[in-house]
Amino acid sequence: MLIPSKLSRPVRLDHTVVRERLLAKLSGANNFRLALVTSPAGYGKTTLVSQWAAGKNELGWYSLDEGDNQQERFASYLIAAIQQATGGHCSTSEAMAQKRQYASLTSLFAQLFIELAQWHRPLYLVIDDYHLITNPVIHDAMRFFLRHQPENFTLVVLSRNLPQLGIANLRVRDQLLEIGSQQLAFNHQEAKQFFDRRLSSPIEAAESSRMCDDVAGWATALQLIALSARQNHTSAHHSARRLAGINASHLSDYLVDEVLDNVDVSTRHFLLKSAILRSMNDALIVRVTGEENGQMRLEEIERQGLFLQRMDDTGEWFSYHPLFGSFLRQRCQWELAAELPEIHRAAAESWMEQGFPSEAIHHALAAGDAQMLRDILLNHAWGLFNHSELALLEESLKALPWESLLENPRLVLLQAWLMQSQHRYSEVNTLLARAEQEIKGVMDGTLHAEFNALRAQVAINDGNPEEAERLAKLALDELPLAWFYSRIVATSVHGEVLHCKGDLSQSLSLMQQTEQMARHHDVWHYALWSLIQQSEIQFAQGFLQAAWETQERAFQLIKEQHLEQLPMHEFLVRIRAQLLWAWARLDEAEASARSGIAVLSTFQPQQQLQCLTLLVQCSLARGDLDNARSQLNRLENLLGNGRYHCDWISNADKVRVIYWQLTGDKKSAANWLRHTPKPAFANNHFLQGQWRNIARAQILLGEFEPAEIVLEELNENARSLRLMSDLNRNLLLLNQLYWQSGRKNDAQRVLLDALQLANRTGFISHFVIEGEAMAQQLRQLIQLNTLPEMEQHRAQRILREINQHHRHKFAHFDEGFVERLLNHPDVPELIRTSPLTQREWQVLGLIYSGYSNEQIAGELAVAATTIKTHIRNLYQKLGVAHRQDAVQHAQQLLKMMGYGV
């Protein structure tokens, strides 16, 4: 819940001096990216900018305090301020900020700018007291903000010092409007206007000018002169002499003498007690000061000129001038030290009554009241956890003694979930074990089950599925239905374990249950996770169309709940890319993989390994080996600099081994095979994939017998577990083994099985990646004209893809190739004496690649009759009568040139 006063522009008071010369300068702010107003405290920064902002509807105001160094809090208020300025135009950004569903501040701002691209009128955001920001993450994000904000957007920053926002760069590019303390200092005319409005009897212009010069135009000093003159009934000139040359560091003594010592005891205590509040309203004042009418007292203090300012148009919220507030808080610690804890307790209670637990925690911490802090956390900690107030929770839990946590074990559970969210898995188990050992008496069974649900999540994250399953089952046996969050966690973990064990049907059922529970209780990250798992299971079962439809539901959930910046979004676009790749939609697959990398742009590069693997796959399917090699260099660098799940390693190894196969790099394959551990089982798609990599390397090295043993066992497991996509892949690799070992009948048999199974999976690229050996077999099957209609159609599609992407490596008779061919000592004499034209060589290559006459005409952009003439001529020169004879002739030429066809 956001405090309204932090988003309200200060109210312009009637007796303030209108700074016309500075307002004229600010009137051109819309021509700059940044308007920066800097000066020490008390020079009138906020007053000036509030005057300038008056009448501007499309302006947001954000008043900072020390708590805004938490980046989640900063983001929530900043987006809320822009929402006020735009009348709710940026709803997606607002939802993401409220739910903390963004990867980083920069990614949230990127989404904001996408929405603001449709906003075409001038727009302003004022951030007051930016000097309070010390978090470098926020500074970095605001530099990003300034670089990328729309042209019609102006950021206005008020600060006591020069903020770390890349000011020099903006200044050089003339994108910075600056107002500093010299300009903010009152001139003689403004000082005269000021005194005329504040003092009952006017003073001469010369005297006013002298006083202005004495204090160097410092607005706070002028205000103190007027206040002192009114309170003490002395001349303003006397006060001015005392303030001459004073600065903020020496102001405390003056404020004691001239302000605090000149108010009655009741007002003094009111000022000191209320100063602990960063913002205040009637209810807070009543509770903290004991005054019966807080609003009336606030208005009275304001009338006395005691540095109190309204924070909103309704006059409900007030705050002290920062300089005066800081002074009062310091005096409060000295004068009311014994009462201070009780004052903070009263403030915490009032904030709680108004529904602001974060502010209440701030005061409970200041009071050092562990019992109050404990009670607030017991009632509100999980809500704060779900809103990602993690830093505040961590600070609060550290402030509680361990004995207090043991007496309230749900707080131990909260601390453990905090550790889990930070991937501190070993610490989670240590903490829970210590708590179970030291909790006095019999531990509540439900709480023990919640501990086990969390332990199960830690175990699966840490790659220990057996322990995860045991703990998840224990948790589900003991958890009441009302304990929905832990039940969702345990059900999800159990489903994931069954997925790892290859029990796909039961795993799918549990993930569907997880989705249903998570949607019902608005636990959106688990709803998304369960959909991703369902899609992976359906893919493994060979139901790729069902997997596609599940992914569509996941994309819709992301859109509805603004989950675009969760790291899980990358998982979804990655499995979408895998599916698109399988269907040979390579451009879309590559785009999905790149969007996954974009989602992870603010994370460690190692997180991008899976998407980078997919980019390599796309290059390999296209036959673009140069690009694949470049991407593999980066991939292998990442592999050497991180720890990865076996699934990630298997996918990365897959593209490496395929690349070695396509380039004939037996040395790399042999070295990899020597050092790669062989999995103990093959009962899920991760392990099947790594065993398949091993078999592919063995085939490349001519180790056909061990490769056949591996593949037959993989097929047996895949059939028993219904891992149909893996079975389809295994059959294709077995086909290559049989083909290369000369067992042509066996090769044809398993290829027919693979084509039939592809009617279910829709696989295309898995065939294409096998290149020319696959193309030769498909040509033969097509020419036999015995394939069923669906298999015939798929074979033709696969052949077209191979021709499109792999022809240049095997069958593209370009000028360089032809020149080398004609100079070969074994070239047939007929070709030497009746050489083909360059066009006829191209036609021969396309015939060899399986193109029909119409397809050749389309490829070469000539008429079909012209192609017939070329074919007739080349048949005559080659001494052949039929297309199949031409194909065999081309194959002999390629073999002669050393191509393994």
Curated annotation (Swiss-Prot):
Activated by ATP and maltotriose, which are both required for DNA binding. The keyword Cell membrane does not apply. GO terms for biological process: positive regulation of carbohydrate metabolic process; positive regulation of DNA-templated transcription. Pfam families: GerE, TPR_MalT. Signal peptide: none annotated. The keyword Transcription applies. Residues 829-894 form the HTH luxR-type domain. It comes from the Bacteria. Gene3D superfamilies: Tetratricopeptide repeat domain (1.25.40.10), Winged helix-like DNA-binding domain superfamily/Winged helix DNA-binding domain (1.10.10.10). Residues 853-872 bind DNA. Belongs to the MalT family. NCBIfam families: PRK04841.1. Monomer in solution. Oligomerizes to an active state in the presence of the positive effectors ATP and maltotriose. Positively regulates the transcription of the maltose regulon whose gene products are responsible for uptake and catabolism of malto-oligosaccharides. Specifically binds to the promoter region of its target genes, recognizing a short DNA motif called the MalT box. PANTHER family: DNA-BINDING TRANSCRIPTIONAL ACTIVATOR DEVR_DOSR. This is HTH-type transcriptional regulator MalT. It comes from Salmonella paratyphi B (strain ATCC BAA-1250 / SPB7). The gene is malT.
